[in-house]
Every structure is written in C-alpha cells, then in structure tokens.
C-alpha cells in the first residue's frame, strides 16, 4: 500500500499509516488539531505526488483527505517504412533521459513497435542505433516529454536500401542464361 505520514502542525503528534488493498487507511482516537498529511511512498507503478494536505480535526467529527496517484508513464516507439508505411522489425533504439538518470535500449518487434511501461517522468532522447541490413539508419534522434499517467508515442520513418535485379537472357529464345 501507500505510506502516509501524519504530523500535527504543533509537532505534538506524529505517526505513519499504510493503506490497505482498498486504497484507504483510518486513524482513530487521535487528538483534535491541525495536521499535515504527506504521501511518503507508493507501490509500483505509481509516482509519489510530493504533495501535502492540511486537515483540521475537530472532536467527534471524521475528516477525509484524498490523494490521486498517477502511474509512471509509458513510451511507445513505432518504426515504419517511409515508402509504404509497413512496420520494420529489428530496429534498436537507445532511450535516454535528458538529465542522464535513466537509459535503456530496446528493439522493435514484428509489428515495428517497442513499448516501455512504467519508466520515470521526464524528457527523453530516442536514438536509432542499429538497423537490419536492408534499412537505412535514421541519424536524427527524437525528443519526447513523458508525463505521469500518460503514454507518449514517437514514430520513425526509414527508407529501405534499394535493390537491383540483373537478368541475363538468350537473344534468340529469351530464356534465362
């Protein structure tokens, strides 16, 4: 569950509580007064909100505070053939947080897709680092900002290397030689 700290503004009372599977926690028989409730830790894949709420507790009354948590963002990378829009499998990307605090690499599947779930919020640079032999490497990285609770998509388009077919035919019969 999520861990919350509860502290009186006078400093006379302090405790922590962990929410149950229903997402709630109840404290009973605490002194009346003004308290600051702060989210301290959350289970994966959520992000600590770093917000506090102040609540006044009065004798004989129940007060409630609600915190809304967002999941860590997701990143989808799509790779397509620029000529026909078909997906390209086997392209490897480096995904780096701009501040250097997170880096990973991943390779497109048979649908030309990579999906990274639950990665840190922040700005990222996505760079193509390896392609199949028939694909031309795209040297221009893309930047994307990932926000809590959202999935962002970046799409890369690549050209396929040209091919050449040579035929040798008999001048009289037209049969292959």
Question: What do these predicted regions represent?
Answer:
Residues 1-177:
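Solvent-exposed loop/turn and edge beta-strand elements of beta-rich ligand-binding domains
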């Amino acid at each position: 569950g999520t861990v919350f700290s509860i502290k009186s503004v006078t400093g006379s009372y302090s405790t922590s509580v962990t929410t149950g599977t229903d997402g709630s926690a109840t404290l009973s028989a605490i002194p009346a007064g003004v308290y600051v409730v702060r989210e301290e830790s959350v289970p994966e894949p959520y992000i600590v909100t770093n917000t506090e709420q102040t609540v006044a507790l009065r004798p004989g009354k129940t007060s409630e505070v609600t915190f809304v948590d967002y999941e860590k963002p997701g990143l989808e990378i799509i790779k397509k053939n620029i000529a026909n829009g078909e997906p390209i499998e086997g392209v490897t990307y480096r995904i780096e947080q701009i501040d250097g605090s997170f880096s990973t690499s991943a390779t497109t599947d048979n649908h030309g897709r990579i999906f990274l779930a639950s990665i840190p919020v922040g700005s990222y640079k996505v760079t193509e680092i390896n392609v199949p032999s028939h694909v031309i490497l795209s040297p221009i990285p893309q930047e994307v900002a990932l926000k809590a609770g959202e999935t962002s998509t970046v799409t890369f388009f690549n050209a396929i290397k040209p091919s050449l077919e040579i035929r040798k035919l008999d001048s009289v019969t037209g049969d292959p030689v």
